Amino acid sequence: MRVLASHKHERTAQAIKEAVAAIISREVKDPRLGFVSVTKVDLARDLSQAKIYISVYGSEEDKKNSFIALNSAKGFIKGELASRVRLRIMPELYFVEDPSIEYGARIMEILEGLKKEAGENESES
């Protein structure tokens, strides 16, 4: 999937991101759906496909259940998206895990550990 860098293309991706985030948070009523956030949308050049990057806060089981819920609600989400964002062709939606927030949290944990370790070493000296 090649991403086109035009301004209109970026605005369309942003509109889809905002609409999908609102639909997931307000309209999807699946109990398997955990705390999720839409972090990014990549659109195919011809708008036939949209990769929707999702960050899930929680355990691996929470992630698995959230993606099952999203994939089972894909048709509903696409229908709601069609009523909110006017496009000639409604893209096929693909939900993809975005580990960047989790990765950032892990880096912060490591930095805090190093900071704590450095403080302990200074007090021993």
Curated annotation (Swiss-Prot):
Gene Ontology CC terms: cytosol
UniProt-listed NCBIfam families: rbfA
GO biological process: maturation of SSU-rRNA
Subunit structure of this chain's protein: Monomer. Binds 30S ribosomal subunits, but not 50S ribosomal subunits or 70S ribosomes.
SUPFAM superfamilies: Ribosome-binding factor A, RbfA
Gene Ontology MF, one: ribosomal small subunit binding
The name this protein goes by in its record: Ribosome-binding factor A
Superkingdom, taxonomy of origin: Bacteria
Keyword annotations: Cytoplasm, Ribosome biogenesis
Subcellular location: Cytoplasm
Function: One of several proteins that assist in the late maturation steps of the functional core of the 30S ribosomal subunit. Associates with free 30S ribosomal subunits (but not with 30S subunits that are part of 70S ribosomes or polysomes). Required for efficient processing of 16S rRNA. May interact with the 5'-terminal helix region of 16S rRNA.
Location, primary (coarse class): cytoplasm
